[in-house]
Amino acid sequence: MDVRRWLLVVLCALASLVQADEGPVPGKITLASEEWNDYTNKDGSGLAWDLLRQIFEPAGITLQTRSEPYTRSVGLAQRGEVDGWVGAYRDEASGVLYPHWNFDSDHIYALGLATTPTPSLATLGNYRLAWVRGYKYEEYLPNLRHFNQIERRDGILPMLQHGRADFYIDSLTEARYVLGQAHDPSQFRLTPIAELPLYIGFADTERGRALMAVYDQRMAALVKSGELKPIFGHWKQPYPF
């Protein structure tokens, strides 16, 4: 047999083995997320859902969304009942896979009374803080000592007005949503605190590994081409890359 022909046969056989070992890429991805206003709306609209469609659907993978409380979303991914959850901080939970690329950054803000001294990342630990249970900001923001975790975003403004906390910590989108409930927004102030990369926490399954590989390949190409910029612009959010 001609040497070149023999080498071609060997290479084709090796390629077939590698492809069989990797397994087929699923045609659908199911992602769970808490319902965040204009980010992961229950009807499938919002910045994050639009970004993820642009990442997966041109690769032949249909996005299926599922709205669940944050801690339940994490648990579903850990048990492999969904392919991943949206809005993970790197290494925040065990038993899942984290990709190389983040798809966005969480713009973390402190909401407080306008009369309270303006906080910074360095001074935040001097204040009494509150945030929604499950977000674990104490693991990502330094020197936090006094904080309470609340079950829902109702009643945050009265909590600040009555001095039960100095600042409420959340992403900019959700902090703006809370501030929008104020009769007089001028009584309050939003202060930027930190930028935390946001990831998909993929299920540690064969499907999850295959989908994560597609995600990282697509993100590298999309960031290089700038194709995600118009989506951030449409939702009036800063471009994080």
Tell where the protein language model's regions lie, with residue ranges.
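Extracytoplasmic small-molecule ligand-binding "clamshell" domains
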Residues: 21-96, 130, 225, 235
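Short beta-strand-to-loop elements that line the ligand-binding cleft
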Residues: 62-69, 145-152, 156-159, 189-190
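Bacterial N-terminal signal peptides
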Residues: 8-16
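A ligand-binding cleft/hinge motif common to bilobed small-molecule-binding domains
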Residues: 75-79, 88-96, 166-194
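Ligand-binding clefts/hinges and TM-proximal coupling segments of bilobed small-molecule sensing domains
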Residues: 136-152, 219-241
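Short amphipathic alpha-helical coupling segments at ligand-binding clamshell hinges
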Residues: 47, 51, 123-125, 171, ...
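Periplasmic-binding protein-like
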Residues: 33-34, 105-108, 180-219, 239-241
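Flexible hinge/capping segments at coil-to-helix
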Residues: 111-129
